């Protein structure tokens, strides 16, 4: 079978997506793709999600920070952006996602928007609610371990 001429091939847009979770969350590629498909199905319906054709091309997550590249059809950029924003939970773990940028090629997407994680994270003991507690510190955000779960705090909450 012959290849389609260039002007008949489908055009794609590539979304660089930043992912933020609690430090102990364990996210996988398969779970994120499933959450993306469910969000597309719920927001756009079956026909709309099939037209947008959202596909996860690359995924990495470690220590509460991650990034992904999501592919969508050229005419469905707004739908894809809204769908990505609707992802709030992956494998029963709460997540925060944001679109860092959109590009026409995978290479440009990686060069411009990937590798810009929120900085390094460090483990510290902080004073929180009158007690010494362990916390993961990322820039000005503190994820304080309370014994059963993490609590998000700012710098002035830990003094």
Swiss-Prot record:
The keyword Nucleus does not apply. It is found in: Cytoplasm. GO terms for biological process: tRNA 5'-leader removal. It is an enzyme of class 3 (hydrolase). InterPro entries: Pop5/Rpp14/Rnp2-like, Rnp2-like_sf. Its EC number is 3.1.26.5. The keyword Nuclease applies. One of its GO terms (cellular component) is cytoplasm. SUPFAM superfamilies: Rnp2-like. Keywords: Cytoplasm, Endonuclease, Hydrolase, Nuclease, tRNA processing. It catalyses: Endonucleolytic cleavage of RNA, removing 5'-extranucleotides from tRNA precursor. It holds the Pfam family RNase_P_Rpp14. Its main location: cytoplasm. One of its GO terms (molecular function) is ribonuclease P activity. Part of ribonuclease P, a protein complex that generates mature tRNA molecules by cleaving their 5'-ends. Belongs to the eukaryotic/archaeal RNase P protein component 2 family. Consists of a catalytic RNA component and at least 4-5 protein subunits. This is Ribonuclease P protein component 2. It comes from Halorubrum lacusprofundi (strain ATCC 49239 / DSM 5036 / JCM 8891 / ACAM 34). The gene is rnp2.
